[in-house]
Structures are given as structure tokens and as C-alpha cells.
Amino acid sequence: MERYFGLHNHTMYSNIRLLDCINRPKDLIDKAIELGLSGIAITDHECLSGHMEVNQYAQKIKEKHPDFKIALGNEIYLVDERTNGIKYYHFILIAKDAIGHKALREMSSTAWYNSYVDRGMERVPITKSELSNIMSRYQGHVIASTACMGGELSTAAYNMTLAEEVNDLVSAQQFYNQICDFMNFCITTFGEDFYIECAPSTAED
């Protein structure tokens, strides 16, 4: 039986815009090894700054833990267009190789170059058209997943369920259409490198 590989993890580098996480990269990696994981991906919130520290520690532990793998990723904010008052959906990207990491850097640079302030916070989204354009040159080198409850798939599915519970079939259909459009976009953009994130939870939603 294959051991678990954690594909969605945050470190203190996710605090670049707001307080989000207290994990130091070294501590997170050590804990993953202690738990018997086969590896983890570092996916901070629109931040690649921790990757150098992660790589340095990966080299340090390579001899003692040769089978433990560390992947480098980014949790981006994916939107249809940049405008105030929108939902900034979370989306996970993980580099499969050095070429994929170059794609992550290009996407992150695009997001930060076009940053703006909305509701008192600096926002750093990337649009779907920008993501699709960049990935047209890097397909096969980046893994994508739907992320957490902050992702578009989870949000739309949750809202569809709420609409169905009150028999609001019009809204439910709209959320269903949103899910279909989102899934088609992801499959077209990432092909077989697109995955749906599943997370255990005791929360009712």
C-alpha cells in the first residue's frame, strides 16, 4: 500500500499578505517524515519565496531520508477577471520538474505585477485566460488541483447543495453550470495533470 503524499501544505511564507500559518519549512518537513508520509508539497498562498529554504533543507536531509520527496507548488487565486468585490478562488499548482517551476514563477510574476487593493487588502489573482495562455507553453509540466473549500469547485458545489435544500432549482442549475464550466476549463488547460482535492473533515459542510 502506497504511503500518503500531502499535496496541500502551508508554511510561514504564506504570511506575506496576512497571518495564515506558523509552520517553519523545516518543522513541517520533519513532522511529515515523523508521520511516515512519502512526501509533501509546499503550496503557500501566492508565494514562492520559501522554495529556496525548502530546497536547501531537502538537500540536507537527502542522505538520511533518500525516499522522502518534496514538491514545490503555489496556491494561487484564480478569477475570471480582475475587479473589486469578487470571490478570489483558491487553486493549487505543483511543479513536476524545473520547467514546471519556471511556469509557476511566470504565473506568480503575472499575479503580483497586476496586484491591486480590494476591501482593504492587496489582491494578487491571476485570470483564467492568463493561466491558460501560460500553460499552453508548459502543459505536462504542472499539476493542478481544485484546492480547499476556498476553491471554485467546492464553493459552487456547496452553494448548489444549499440551493437544492430550499428547492431553489434556478440557482442550483446556475451553480451546476458553473461547476461544468470550471471543470471543462481545468481539463482543457491541464489534461491528465488535473486532480480534485479531497480532504477529511468533521464539519457539516
Predicted segment positions?
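Phosphodiester-processing cores and adjacent nucleic acid-binding clamps
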Residues: 1-205
